[in-house]
Amino acid sequence: MKEKTPLDAIKTIENQSSVEDLYSQLTDLSPKIVTMFTPSNRSEEEEGFLSGEVRDPQFYYEKLNSADFDEAAEKIQEIGNKILNHPSLPPSHRGIYEEFIADYSKKTTLLNYAQQYNNAKSEEEKKAAAEKYRYLNIESYGEPDEDTYRSLLGGKLNAIHSKKLTGKADELRKELFGMVNFKPGMDIPERFRPSDETVEWMHSVAESLYGGMLSHIPNEQEEFDPYELQKIFTDIIEEEFNNDSKGYAGAAEGWTVSAEKATSVNVKSSEKRIVIPDNGMMRSRKKVENLVVHEIGVHMLRSITGGETDMLPLRSGLSDYYDAEEGLGVVMEQALSGKFAERGVDHYITAGLAYYDEKDFRGAFEVKWRLSLLDSVRDGGEINDEQIEKAKKTAFTQTLRSFRGTNDIPLFKDLSYYNGSVEVWRYLESIKGDDFLLSLLLAGKVNTSADHRRVILESKSA
């Protein structure tokens, strides 16, 4: 065999895809859990469930059940190995890429287990798939803390118990207390909250950072449909990012906004795309402001700033970044209003109902709509059919978010809203107004750990 010459080695390197090209191929294989876990038959199942025709919805997941996750896992490993063995990859970057590739593999396997559960031909197969799914779900997203769950639920139940209710409201309260384990006057442990000084500091940050973006929301309008929201987002991307010569200067080139079938507004960083559900939902001005801050001002912005470095995973998210990603979005919404309020409580309670109280979809739903409705009623307040219908629709959506993918097993992905907001507020409290340390949190998709801060500090402009 002819021995390779230095010239042959040079030609081999020239013919190799770059790390950036390989990374782009890898992110094309991103485990799209939100997309895969979107039911194809939601409207029909929702109608039958809310009318009482069926006890439990049987959602069908067309994209999930037809995907080839074994092939996807093989490609992730193949491309991942090419990146890790690439001559242009700095040795100091290797560990970050290893964690990133491992996370993609883990999330792809989680989708595979959900598919196996849905397509199981026997109870034995279903049980085996369920066990594997539950384990990897907790490994990926954590599990609800029981003390926190009991505290959050107990706080709401104590408040409802102390209200002076009559008629239909009192009847619903009795029904609710018959569904949950509640002891009047139960001790509620104190939970973390940031100081007023930290909230005020973040309020000034939000006003400065997002003032230009929010100026694109028409002043004279109070409600917005999906296509009006699409235009607002598109205008912000063009004017505040691409045409801003002093600021981001074209950093959002290639980013688009579409209105299409979806369950929620979703930033798809790997595709440079923001998706808005085309379901006709009208959103208030306040809700649109929060979406601008959360979706563009956090999710999209951190992807753009991370993409401007030589550490490509900062564009998509380092390992274990997700809680802080959603947490920062929630924190910035609160910072804009200048008021702290616990967020993600409803998601946390749904997870706790399913995990600790073993409620199925119907069981969790029946608790949630009563809890939400009675939480909003004042002393002596009346409850009408319209309020009940609205509460049921909201509870259905929230319960679906928790049980999506399998219909039976709670997905803990949405714990990030509560856990992440606490993580970020604790971090902000600890840095006490340090704008530089705050800027590191906006410089890519990272969490609040010292390890992630070090990655940001050691990265270089691309």
List each model region and its residues.
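Secondary-structure capping and boundary motifs in well-ordered enzyme cores
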Residues: 284-289, 293, 320-325, 391, ...
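Conserved alpha-helical "signature site"
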Residues: 343-462
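Short, charged/polar micro-motifs that form catalytic or ligand-binding hotspots
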Residues: 90-94, 223, 282-287, 315-319, ...
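N-terminal helix-rich structural modules
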Residues: 1-150
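Post-HExxH zinc-binding segment in Zn-dependent metallohydrolases
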Residues: 315-359, 420
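Active-site His/Glu-centered metal-binding helix of metallohydrolases
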Residues: 292-301
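Post-HEXXH active-site segment of zinc metalloproteases
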Residues: 285-286, 301-326
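Contiguous, non-catalytic segments that form substrate-binding/exosite surfaces or channel walls
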Residues: 94-283
